[in-house]
Structure formats: C-alpha cells, structure tokens
Amino acid sequence: MDLKQYITQVKDWPKPGVNFKDITTIMDNGAAYKYATDQIVEYAKEKQVDIVVGPEARGFIIGCPVAYAMNIGFAPVRKKGKLPREVISYEYELEYGTNVLTMHKDAIKPGQRVLITDDLLATGGTIEATIKLVESLGGIVAGIAFIIDLKYLNGMEKLKGYDVISLVEYEVE
C-alpha cells in the first residue's frame, strides 16, 4: 500500500511557508491505519521489543496500537507537569527557546528493549530527548519507527547509531 496517497498536505499551516503533512487522513481510513500499524508491528517483532514509548500526542496514536497488537506495554512521554507520579525530565532546544519532556521514573526497567514511535521525524529534537529519557532509565533503544521522515530537515542526523524505519519519506518540502 502506498501510504503517501493517504497523507494530506496542508499548505501554509501552522504558519506561512510550511507544507504540513497531516496523518489524520491515514487514521480515518481503517485499511491505511491498519497497514501502517502492521508494518511497525513487524519491525518491532524483529527488534524483539519489550515495551513501546511515544511522545505526546501523535506518538501515542502510533505507539498504542503497536503495543496492543504485541500484547506489551506503552509508556507515554509528556510535557512537563502532565504526569502524576515521580518523573525524570530532559530539557532540549527548540528553534526559539526550550522544551521539557518527562516520563515516569518507573516506566522503563533496566535492560528493557524499547521501540520509540512517533508520527513524523522533522528535526529530531523530540525523539533525541525521548532517547535520553529511555536510556537514563536503563532502557535499550532497540528501534525507532515513524510514519513520515521529512528528509530535507535532516532529523536522521540526531539518530545516528540507532535502527530507524519510516514508512513514507519526503525528500523535498
């Protein structure tokens, strides 16, 4: 299945000059959503993962059905102040400022093989922060899976040394 045909491009959103790649049109098509999920499940099985981790919000949309299909857990990564128990945090740079991601301190056990999922790889900052959180808890990043890789933003540079798949690639904006 060619998933690219199910991705809607929205020009000048959320700001002028951006050509937004909207995956909700994959999600609202049962066959496309199942296909994307199944592709990531097969990858995760090859990597023998124990748990899936995803940053809010679209990492949940991708990761939860994968975890469910594999009968394994899902650990959310959230913005500061959104998780109710003791957390670890990681601050990272944005184009204009910083952001902080957190996860529960007991979400990953040392030695667990982790699949990190998100909808889209852009600059790689969010996933790099997620990797830092997982590894600080002793988790092993066995694989990283995206629906979309915006290759022209060079996010893969931050993920060197990790096994990464993306189901759709855009070479140019």
From Swiss-Prot:
GO terms for molecular function: adenine binding; adenine phosphoribosyltransferase activity; AMP binding. InterPro entries: Ade_phspho_trans (IPR005764), PRibTrfase_dom (IPR000836), PRTase-like (IPR029057), UPRTase/APRTase (IPR050054). Gene3D superfamilies: 3.40.50.2020. Pfam families: Pribosyltran. SUPFAM superfamilies: PRTase-like (SSF53271). Its main location: cytoplasm. It is found in: Cytoplasm. The keyword Nucleotide-binding does not apply. Belongs to the purine/pyrimidine phosphoribosyltransferase family. Homodimer. This is Adenine phosphoribosyltransferase. It comes from Macrococcus caseolyticus (strain JCSC5402). The gene is apt.
